[in-house]
Amino acid sequence: MKIINGSMAAMLASATICGPAFAQDATTAAADPMDRGVFAGDWFMVGIGAGVRPSYEGSDDYVLFPAPLAQGSIGGIDFGARGAGLYADLIADSDSASAVKFVAGPLFRVRPDRNGNIKDPVVRLLGKEDVAIEVGATLGVSFAKLINPFDNLALSTDIQWDVAGAHKGRLISPSVSYSTPLSTAIFTSLSLSATHVDGNYADTYFSIDSVGSAASGLPQFDADGGWKSYGASLLGGVDLSGDARDGGWGVFGLVIYSRLTGDAKRSPVTSLRGDADQWFLAGGISYTF
């Protein structure tokens, strides 16, 4: 499953630059709703946090991981974190008032799954996998002003291929997300997504050959490609000054649930040694300027 579809900073920007309609403070409510503040031109967001995740895809053991954040926009070109990687939207937003916007650009991510920090002693006997380097593209469209003047519904698809020879596979991840501000300081976003993988990816992370079976005692298993997972994520952020338009410090939190399906669920690394239900929890602090 794609951990976060779309830029957290983009959701923060779209959710908070129009916050006067939701503000409870009378003075703020009277402010110009088109005042984009720090988001009117080039802007950057950096942050650091931490979280917990499964020790491998399908594991029921959890490990700590760092959660750095880097997002921004230069000349209308948005860029930022996409899971353990980066993306760029090469379609500049020339008309900020438009209700329909298109997204298209490159992405890459690093996938260190089963490369280390494997907590399960039996799965560890299967050996380590190489770190995958995946490159591809993201395509999408977003629609603003659906339920209120400042919300946003985004539909997108990521497609990526391993170019490092780790799994030599392909992933396709469609998603839909809805974001809205709750005030000038608070925003939230809900996303639903799924991931389809090819046979090379499934074979690398979920198959067990005769050598692996002899080493671990797990039964042999031949995994096929297909829909690997589906899930949902809930993201929230709070600007500590009370108005995100002025930039500065903020805090964020993220909860992701993913359900493995198909051969990813049936594989012994999941069905016998792990759990098809996967959780990711993260939080941290950010600074926008």
Enumerate the language-model features and the residues they cover.
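Transmembrane beta-strand segments that form the barrel wall of outer-membrane beta-barrel proteins
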Residues: 46-54, 78-88, 120-124, 152-163
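Transmembrane beta-strands of outer-membrane beta-barrel proteins
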Residues: 42-48, 68, 79, 102-106, ...
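Cleavable N-terminal export/targeting peptides
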Residues: 1-40
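Outer-membrane beta-barrel transmembrane domain signature
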Residues: 141-145, 162-250, 257-265, 287-289
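Residues that define the transmembrane beta-barrel architecture of outer-membrane proteins
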Residues: 42, 62-68, 100, 129-135, ...
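Residues on the lipid-exposed face of transmembrane beta-strands in outer-membrane beta-barrel proteins
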Residues: 48-52, 68-74, 86-92, 106, ...
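Short loop/turn motifs that connect adjacent beta-strands in outer-membrane beta-barrel proteins
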Residues: 24-25, 30-43, 58, 77-102, ...
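Outer-membrane beta-barrel translocator domains and adjoining extracellular loop/strand segments
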Residues: 34, 58-62, 116-123, 167-172, ...
